[in-house]
Design a protein with these regions (language model features):
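ATP-binding N-terminal substructure of ATP-dependent carboxylate-amine bond-forming enzymes
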Residues: 1-83, 87-93, 100, 112-118
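Basic phosphate/pyrophosphate-binding loop/patch that engages nucleotide-derived ligands
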Residues: 97-105
């Protein structure tokens, strides 16, 4: 929980809610507040646990960065894998993937590099 994005405070609230819910059933919960600033020291503590419950919001917590780090270190975690996280963070790409699977999605406009591209 925590992180370095503008959503840090909501991530802490989410983490605290998860801790409260899990503590009714599990005794050994170890909250870890992290900041992805090229500091991977949190990995030593995470590796001691059975599973990581990812409560990070925005930025590295949702864009696949933290998921990639956990995957590279063979750490089990909750939530989407790094590839799905990267795709979903880019709404244009996620809509293209959805369409490629035959799922209808409303038309959209992509604004990129000062130009409009209607899809």
């Amino acid at each position: 929980m925590g992180g370095s994005s503008s959503e840090k405070n909501i991530s802490i609230k989410t983490g605290n809610a998860i801790i409260k819910a899990l503590s009714t059933k599990y005794n050994s919960i170890c909250p870890i507040s992290i900041s992805i600033d090229n500091d991977l020291s949190f990995l030593k503590q995470i590796k001691k646990g059975d599973i990581v419950f990812n409560a990070l919001h925005g930025g590295s917590g949702e864009n696949g960065d933290i998921q990639s780090i956990l995957e590279l270190n063979n750490i089990i975690y909750t939530g989407s894998n790094s590839k799905a996280s990267k795709i979903c963070m880019d709404k244009h790409v996620s809509k293209l993937v959805v369409q490629s699977e035959g799922i209808t999605t409303p038309d959209w406009i992509l604004y990129k590099n000062s130009k409009f591209s209607k899809q």
